[in-house]
Regions:
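The beta1-alpha1 cofactor-binding region of Rossmann-like NAD(H)/NADP(H)-dependent oxidoreductases
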Residues: 12-23, 55
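Substrate-binding pocket helix/loop in short-chain dehydrogenase/reductase
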Residues: 49-50, 54-62
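Active-site loop immediately N-terminal to the catalytic Tyr-X3-Lys motif
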Residues: 51, 98-104
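Active-site helix of classical SDR
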Residues: 73, 109
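Residue(s) in the substrate-gating loop at a strand-loop-helix junction
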Residues: 93
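Active-site-adjacent segment of SDR/Rossmann-fold oxidoreductases
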Residues: 98, 119-129
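C-terminal helical subdomain
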Residues: 129, 133-134, 154-199
Length: 200
């Protein structure tokens, strides 16, 4: 593997297909035992002026960013409840806490992730399962590859340059690992991190 993880089980799935995710989890558990942590990172960003954005882009974001999230949770939730142990990290965004120009439907999907995370955390706490929502600002990832509207993309990149760039994905990964390593009876309910110079 490119990441030099020889014990990894790699599966290509469409998160909109619940059975594909379930099968991937089954294969992973067959190789390594029960899932103790799931990082729910189903999401694309089709950012654009809502007045000219094709509705097909709305459909794609809603299907992946909401249904994909729930399909991923569904694949591990029952097992974690039965074992009374596990941690689910829900990848939202600061766009799930406030709205931004050209993020209309994207923000809606991330508000969904926030609401579902709060409800899941309440429900699964009775089973000693932790649900942690991640709300990052601008991170250096490939998320902009999903932005098809060239004006929106140019505006986003200009704002990113003004703040000195995004934070590295490794910083966010360190926070995730740190929160995961707390004892099961302790939970960091939400992680919100942005570049220091991000004003919004």
């Amino acid at each position: 593997l490119e990441m030099n993880l020889p014990n990894a089980v790699v599966e290509t799935v469409d998160v909109r297909q619940r059975d594909q995710i379930a099968e991937a989890v089954t294969n992973g558990e067959a190789a390594h035992g029960p899932v103790d942590m799931m990082f729910v990172n189903a999401g694309i960003a089709r950012l654009a002026d809502i007045g000219r954005q094709p509705p097909e882009e709305w459909d794609e974001m809603i299907d992946i960013n909401t249904k994909g999230v729930m399909n991923t949770v569904h694949a591990v939730m029952k097992g974690m409840m039965e074992r009374r142990r596990g941690t689910i990290f829900m990848m939202s965004s600061i766009a799930g806490r406030k709205v931004y120009p050209d993020h209309t439907v994207y923000c809606g999907t991330k508000y969904f992730v926030h609401a579902v995370s709060e409800s899941l955390r309440d429900y699964l706490s009775d089973y000693n399962v932790r649900v942690i929502v991640l709300s990052p600002g601008v991170i250096e990832t490939e998320v902009l590859s999903g932005v098809l509207d060239q004006q929106t993309l140019a505006d986003y990149k200009a704002n990113k340059i003004k703040m000195g760039g995004g934070i590295s994905a490794e910083i966010v990964a360190d926070l995730i690992l740190n929160a995961y390593n707390y004892p099961q009876e302790a939970i960091v309910q939400e992680i919100c991190i942005t570049p220091t110079r991000q004003k919004f």
